[in-house]
Structure formats: C-alpha cells, structure tokens
UniProtKB/Swiss-Prot annotation:
This is ATP synthase subunit beta. The gene is atpD. It is a peripheral membrane protein. Belongs to the ATPase alpha/beta chains family. It comes from Verminephrobacter eiseniae (strain EF01-2). GO terms for molecular function: ATP binding; ATP hydrolysis activity; proton-transporting ATP synthase activity, rotational mechanism.
C-alpha cells in the first residue's frame, strides 16, 4: 500500500499546553490524531476541530519553545505505543519512549492507545477468589480474579503502601504478568517501586525479557496531557497481554490524578466546569477507561486502583464516579490509622460483591458478617462508654466490646514492604487461617487473652504465643 501523503499544518496560537494548528480545509486531522514536529519528540493530540481548518490540540510534553508559524505534520493515526514482550522490565512514558536509560524499546509490535471496550459477548465474568494474604481484605472485601478493586483513602492513610503490599503478595506469587501505571504520583514512589521489583526479581535486570512487569509513568511534574493519557498507555499494554491469552494484573496509582488531569485539560479547552469544578465529561471519561479494564474469554485483567479521596469526602464526584465501576472497594480510614492499626482498612465501609455465600462459602460469609456485626455493636456503644463508662454496660455488651477490641487489633498485620520502618517481619496469612482466627474470637475461644496479644500478629496461633510472653 502506498504511503499516505504527509499533511502539514502550522501553529497559529499557543497558550500553555493548548496549541491551535491550521491545516488545509480539506485535510483537517481527525479527533485523537497525533501531530509531530520535525526534529522534536513533542507530540500534540487533536482534541477539538474549531472550523476553517483549525484544530485545538493538547501538548503531550512541555510546550516551551513553541511559536506561531512552526510546521506540524499529521501522522494520520492516534498515538501508538510499543506492546508485548518488549515492554517487560522497562519504564516508559506516555508515548512508550524509555525513561530507564536502558536503550530503545523494540517497536515491532505497537497498538493505538484509543480503542473500543470488548463487546458484551466477549466478556467472561469470574467467580474465582484472589487470595491476598492480608486478613482484613480476604475476610470482609475479598477480591475476584479478573475483577476491579479500588483502594480509597485520603492523604497519608496508606494507599500506596497497601498497593505495594498487594503487589508484593500477588504479583510475586502470580505466574502471569503485571503492568504498573503511575498516574500523576510522586516520582520518588515510582523509583522506589522499580528498585523493589528489581530486588525481588520481578524485574530481571540481566535478561529483561524474563521480567514479569511493565511500568508506565506520567508523574506529578508532567503536563496534564501526559497524566491524562498515561493510564491509557498502561492499559493498552495490559490489553495486549490479555489478548495473547494471559492473566494480567493492572495496577494504577492514582485514578484521582487521572480525573484531575482531565479537569485541567477540560479547563484549558474552555469547557464549562460542572460540580466542584470537575469536567462535564467526567463520567464518560471514567467509563471509557474502566470499561476497557475487563476480562474476556481469551484472558483476564485483574485491576487494583488507588483512589485519592479529597478532604476524606467519599461523596466527592471523582471517587463517587469511580465507585460505580468496581467489584471490591477497600476504604482506608483516618480514624483507624490514628489508633495505630495498619492496614487502616475500615471493615464496615469496605464492600465486595464476592462476599456472597454462593461464592466464598457459608462459613467465610458467616464469620465475616459476625465480625462486622460485633464491630458495628461496638461503634453504637462508643458514645455510651464515653459518657457513662464501661461499668454501666450490660454483661453481653461488655463481652461484645471486649471481642470487638480484639477483632480490631487482630485486623492489623505487619507488612513485608514496611519491614524497614517497623522492624517486624511481614506476615502472609492464608485465607483458611484468617477464617479460623476470627471464628475463634467471635465464638469466645480467645476471651481469656489480653487484647494487646492480637496487635500486629499474623495467625491466631501467634496471638496465643504472644499472650504467654505478655503474661
């Protein structure tokens, strides 16, 4: 097939990250077409057609040095990024260019970052549980293989640490591949993650093709266009592995920054903001991303997404829009973190559609509901205790409070990724042990133990051992 004739235009206006480019009227670029400059790595993505041959674009990179009259070439295709084995063990930016100083990425296989979600008849829902080794998650909000999970939390309650522990427990034991998309987060965290993966062998620095993870970063210091599109770049790589018939883990840190980048781009394009200043297309943008993160009859994508909650307000439009797309929600609470209980997961706020007796089994379901019931009773009694003290409670309420406090402490657990800070070795607790431990507490088999014996231990047997030392 003959090469399409190159269509060129020139810049007519440049305001920050927004660049207007004029083309011949009969050769206007399509929405999402990528435009390139000669001798520069900068790419523009078409967002609007203004008429009279002028298109409005967003710069995916710094627009410093751009001026009116510069010649721009239309690639006549959306942004494409390298996919497949060549991406394993590599760190790339939004355009698929390497940023790990380990040479170019093989471009033999490439794919457009914009594509339709799989058709309804191609989807394959899964009922299999994904064991994480984290007690509170496995008990009250279990993950589904091929499902979508959100880690919700305000600033500094442990979203990234929880995400790193999940990567540590799942990705290392997981025989498939992982893709990590760093969307608008700290560069330091991205760097730490890379070195952690290299130390654990998930990234094989000697033979990169034997690595099990691909990394795509568009960090906080980058222009909004990069932060908006980097999630799609990571997703495109994950989709290509899924379409090869593999089971893929897709980690996103942080979905809120994706929304925020969309807000910035929307404002730059002159759209009227909607509630709380967000873009009017918030639900559509979120849906377009989330609908592509799905499992088909060929392979699966299990996605774990950190979601920042501004001002700890879960009703904010950004986290509220994300909720609708998830199978499991893990809500991190500042109140629980302030008690020194980590992971600071709120067992009463976190949900999972997997917590169903037909999926997890009757025993698991009963224990989880009994744990939640005991904690809920403690929550209701807290005001009475604060005013009148423990002595005024009925004997059965005193017992419920004692058990709830033990459950609360038993929900804490030392993490592998936090060993450096805590000094205590991380614990991986199998699901069967988690159920056995909580069942014993709920049934009163651990009533004689002091509550500090349950703090920061793995299994219930460790709590019994610790009680002997405490005594």
């Amino acid at each position: 097939m003959a090469q399409a004739e190159a269509v060129q235009g020139k810049i007519v206006q440049c305001i920050g990250a927004v660049v207007d480019v004029e083309f011949p009227r009969d050769k206007m670029p399509k929405i999402y077409d990528a435009l390139k400059f000669e001798g520069s790595a900068l790419t523009l993505e078409v967002q609007q057609q203004l008429g009279d041959g002028v298109v409005r674009t967003i710069a995916l990179g710094s627009s410093d040095g751009l001026r009116r009259g510069l010649i721009v070439t239309n690639t006549q295709a959306p942004i494409t990024v390298p996919v497949g084995k060549a991406t394993l063990g590599r760190i790339m930016d939004v355009l698929g260019a390497p940023i790990d100083e380990r040479g170019p990425v093989d471009q033999t296989l490439t794919a457009s970052i914009h594509r339709k979600a799989p058709a309804y008849d191609e989807l394959s829902p899964s009922q299999d549980l994904l064991e994480t080794g984290i007690k509170v998650i496995d008990l009250v909000c279990p993950f589904a293989k091929g499902g979508k999970v959100g880690l919700f939390g305000g600033a500094g309650v442990g979203k990234t640490v929880n995400m790193m522990e999940l990567i540590n427990n799942i990705a290392k034991a997981h025989s498939g591949l992982s893709v990590f998309a760093g969307v608008g987060e700290r560069t330091r965290e991205g760097n730490d993650f890379y070195h952690e993966m290299a130390d654990s062998g998930v990234v094989n620095l000697e033979k990169l093709e034997n690595s099990k993870v691909a990394m795509v970063y568009g960090q906080m210091n980058e222009p909004p266009g990069n932060r908006l599109r980097v999630a799609l770049t990571g997703l495109t790589i994950a989709e290509s592995f899924r379409d090869e018939g593999r089971d893929v883990l897709f980690f996103v840190d942080n979905i809120y920054r994706y929304t925020l980048a969309g807000t910035e781009v929307s404002a730059l394009l002159g759209r009227m903001p909607s509630a709380v200043g967000y873009q009017p297309t918030l639900a559509e943008e979120m849906g377009r991303l989330q609908e592509r993160i799905t499992s088909t009859k060929v392979g699966s994508i299990t996605s774990i997404q950190a979601v920042y909650v501004p001002a700890d307000d879960l009703t904010d439009p950004s986290p509220a829009t994300t909720f609708a797309h998830l199978d499991s929600t893990v809500v991190l609470s500042r109140d629980i973190a302030s008690l020194g209980i980590y992971p600071a997961v709120d067992p009463l706020d976190s949900t999972s559609r997997q917590l169903d007796p037909n999926v997890v089994g009757q025993e698991h379901y009963n224990v989880a509901r009994a744990v939640q019931g005991t904690l809920q009773r403690y929550k209701e009694l807290r005001d009475i205790i604060a005013i009148l003290g423990m002595d005024e409670l009925a004997p059965e309420d005193k017992l419920a409070v004692a058990r709830a406090r033990k459950i609360q402490r038993f929900l804490s657990q030392p993490f592998h990724v936090a060993e450096v800070f805590t000094g205590s070795p991380g614990k991986y607790v199998p699901l069967s042990e988690t159920i056995r431990g909580f069942k014993m507490i709920v049934n009163g088999e651990a009533d004689h133990l002091p509550e500090q014996a349950f703090y920061m231990v793995g299994t219930i047997d460790e709590a019994f051992e610790k009680a002997k030392k405490v005594a």
